[in-house]
């Protein structure tokens, strides 16, 4: 079979000329048995790397037991998964979805219902420039990218975009219909921009004063990637709503939005929202395995231990190559800005030739999202392969 045959697939992706067949640890292998060091982890999904023995065993055991029922019945896995996620997030109530964009949609509905119950119809949102929250119509409305939005307008009305890390720009946009402020705790596609602590605290204060909900999008930066379970913890604040996906299932299609009790008591009720597949026994077995393995293998400790070395390795490249301009990020979510004279797509292609997988973000940035099981020798290997690629320019 020709794996590159695309005649029956809607052409929404520009794929690299690589056919991936299997993975092991932090490595992927193509159909020609070429071994790649993966520093993209399926766009931040595969936190435990590939072919993790315990994770696979838990999933296989559940496959033999029960794949799916529906949310008309109880299942033990969803209860445990919700407890794990509520504890990790320091929030109270969980709704499981199938993806990140669905989690955003659910968060938006929750915020609208909360505002509606206060007498505010058509609640409005404040999001941020350079944001990315998803591609379904609601999430797309919060995504500040005209290229993505233009063919699908009109989108949800009343969305305003503030300047990230600038509280005064947010304050100017708040009105009596504002129901929520949403931000990525670390902007991903927009260029790996972390929210600074003072900004996050000021947002929390503003939301408390105005009874506006604060939504933290942790889909890419959450689940340990920042060195804490969720990146908002670095600012020592709690959002009212948090969205999760990607590494929550480490390859299984699962997302969630999590809310505090105040919001839970004043928003969604039976019949307000639903999902056929959301929280089924299989994906929740995977979620529970992820939390169990994170604890057993001290995944957060590993990220915190190795982050300084990863940052140092990238900083050395900035010192060595004039066109490497700036490093940004938090934990195992890092970006390296390149001068416009060197196209990031060409650097990524050279890296692939050197058996290193990276992806882009921002205007012209390399994005580093390695599996959280990364070891020091893998950082050294990445530096060697990337340095070799950069010497071509």
Curated annotation (Swiss-Prot):
Gene Ontology biological-process entries: L-arginine biosynthetic process
UniProt-annotated location(s): Cytoplasm
Q: How is the cofactor bound?
A: Binds 1 pyridoxal phosphate per subunit.
Q: What is the residue range of the signal peptide feature?
A: none
CDD domains reported in the protein's UniProt record: OAT_like
Top-level EC class, please? transferase
Q: Which cofactor(s) does the record list?
A: pyridoxal 5'-phosphate
What keywords are assigned to this protein? Amino-acid biosynthesis, Aminotransferase, Arginine biosynthesis, Cytoplasm, Pyridoxal phosphate, Transferase
Question: Is Heme set as a keyword in this record?
Answer: no
Q: Which residues bind N(2)-acetyl-L-ornithine?
A: 135, 275
Task: Name one cellular component (GO) term.
Answer: cytoplasm
Residue(s) carrying N6-(pyridoxal phosphate)lysine: 246
**What Gene3D superfamilies is this protein classified in?**
Aspartate Aminotransferase, domain 1, Type I PLP-dependent aspartate aminotransferase-like (Major domain)
Functional pathway: Amino-acid biosynthesis; L-arginine biosynthesis; N(2)-acetyl-L-ornithine from L-glutamate: step 4/4
Has keyword Transferase?
A: yes
Under catalytic activity, the entry for this protein gives: N(2)-acetyl-L-ornithine + 2-oxoglutarate = N-acetyl-L-glutamate 5-semialdehyde + L-glutamate
Supply the EC number(s): 2.6.1.11
Q: Which NCBIfam families match?
A: argD, PRK01278.1
Q: What else is known?
A: May also have succinyldiaminopimelate aminotransferase activity, thus carrying out the corresponding step in lysine biosynthesis.
Subunit comment: Homodimer.
* Family note: Belongs to the class-III pyridoxal-phosphate-dependent aminotransferase family. ArgD subfamily.
Concerning HAMAP family, the annotation shows: ArgD_aminotrans_3
User: What is this protein's record name?
Assistant: Acetylornithine aminotransferase
What organism does this protein naturally occur in?
Campylobacter jejuni subsp. jejuni serotype O:2 (strain ATCC 700819 / NCTC 11168)
């Amino acid at each position: 079979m020709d794996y590159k045959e695309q005649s029956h697939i809607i052409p929404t992706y520009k794929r690299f000329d690589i056919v991936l067949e299997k993975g092991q640890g932090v490595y992927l292998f193509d159909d020609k048995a070429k071994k790649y060091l993966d520093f993209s982890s399926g766009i931040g999904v595969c936190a435990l790397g590939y072919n993790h023995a315990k994770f696979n065993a838990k999933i296989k055991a559940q496959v033999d037991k029960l794949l799916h029922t529906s949310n008309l019945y109880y299942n033990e896995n969803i209860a445990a998964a919700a407890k794990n996620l509520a504890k990790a997030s320091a929030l109270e109530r969980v709704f499981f979805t199938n993806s990140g964009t669905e989690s955003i949609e659910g968060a938006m509905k929750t915020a609208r219902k909360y505002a509606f119950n206060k007498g505010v119809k058509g609640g409005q949102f404040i999001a941020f420039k350079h944001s990315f929250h998803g591609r379904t119509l609601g999430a797309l409305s919060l995504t500040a990218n005209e290229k993505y939005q233009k063919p699908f307008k009109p989108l949800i009305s009343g969305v305003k975009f503030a300047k990230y890390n600038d509280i005064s720009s947010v304050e100017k946009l708040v009105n009596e219909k504002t129901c929520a402020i949403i931000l990525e705790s670390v902007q991903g596609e927009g260029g790996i921009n972390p929210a600074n602590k003072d900004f996050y605290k000021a947002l929390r204060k503003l939301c408390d004063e105005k009874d506006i909900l604060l939504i933290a999008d942790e889909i890419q930066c959450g689940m340990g990637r920042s060195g804490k379970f969720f990146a908002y913890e670095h600012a020592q604040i709690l959002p009212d709503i948090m969205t999760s996906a990607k590494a929550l299932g480490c390859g299984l299609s699962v997302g969630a939005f999590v809310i505090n009790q105040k919001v839970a008591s004043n928003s969604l009720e039976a019949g307000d929202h639903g999902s056929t597949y959301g929280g089924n026994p299989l994906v929740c077995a995977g979620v529970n395995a992820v939390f169990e393995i994170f604890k057993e293998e001290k995944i957060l400790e590993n990220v915190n231990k190795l982050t300084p070395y990863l940052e140092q390795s990238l900083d050395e490249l900035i010192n060595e190559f004039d066109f490497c301009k700036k490093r940004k990020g938090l934990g195992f979510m890092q970006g390296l800005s390149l001068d416009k004279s060197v196209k990031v797509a060409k650097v990524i292609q050279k890296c692939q030739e050197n058996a290193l997988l990276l992806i882009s973000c921002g205007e012209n940035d390399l994005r580093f999202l390695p599996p959280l099981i990364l070891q020091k020798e893998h950082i050294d290997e990445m530096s060697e392969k990337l340095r070799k690629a950069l010497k071509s320019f």
